[in-house]
């Protein structure tokens, strides 16, 4: 049983760092149940992955695309529905900003209001 080395694979993938990334990704794929394309020969998954790359039974380009795809994150942007946009944009029937009156509070009124607040009960988390 001959062990595969990085030297056997370097002609398939030029960059050693990229080779390690691809072999690691393929080893994780094998661990998650992906079928292997070479005889296992009692080898562990990283060795099997390197042997697959060296024997060209898996394409490094396909592995690279799959690795990139697995690392990408897709976040869904919550956009407003088309029918609600005109309702928000139009201010017909709405109150004009100049008509809004806000209550003003002095500093003394604020302090008096804060002093009237009851502190929350002490929990077990606050002790110790």
UniProtKB/Swiss-Prot annotation:
CC terms in the record's Gene Ontology section: DNA-directed RNA polymerase complex
Source taxon at top rank: Bacteria
Record key words, sorted: DNA-directed RNA polymerase, Nucleotidyltransferase, Transcription, Transferase
GO molecular function: DNA binding; DNA-directed RNA polymerase activity
EC number annotated for this UniProt entry: 2.7.7.6
SUPFAM superfamilies with a match to the protein in the record: RPB6/omega subunit-like (SSF63562)
One Pfam family of this chain: RNA_pol_Rpb6
InterPro entries reported in the protein's UniProt record: DNA-dir_RNA_pol_omega (IPR003716), Pol_omega/Rpo6/RPB6 (IPR006110), RPB6/omega-like_sf (IPR036161)
GO biological process: DNA-templated transcription
Recorded catalytic activity of this chain's protein: RNA(n) + a ribonucleoside 5'-triphosphate = RNA(n+1) + diphosphate
Enzyme class: transferase
Family as reported in the entry's similarity comment: Belongs to the RNA polymerase subunit omega family.
Quaternary context: The RNAP catalytic core consists of 2 alpha, 1 beta, 1 beta' and 1 omega subunit. When a sigma factor is associated with the core the holoenzyme is formed, which can initiate transcription.
Role played: Promotes RNA polymerase assembly. Latches the N- and C-terminal regions of the beta' subunit thereby facilitating its interaction with the beta and alpha subunits.
PANTHER family, sorted: DNA-DIRECTED RNA POLYMERASE SUBUNIT OMEGA
UniProt cross-references to NCBIfam families, sorted A to Z: rpoZ (TIGR00690)
Protein name in the entry: DNA-directed RNA polymerase subunit omega
Organism of this sequence: Azorhizobium caulinodans (strain ATCC 43989 / DSM 5975 / JCM 20966 / LMG 6465 / NBRC 14845 / NCIMB 13405 / ORS 571)
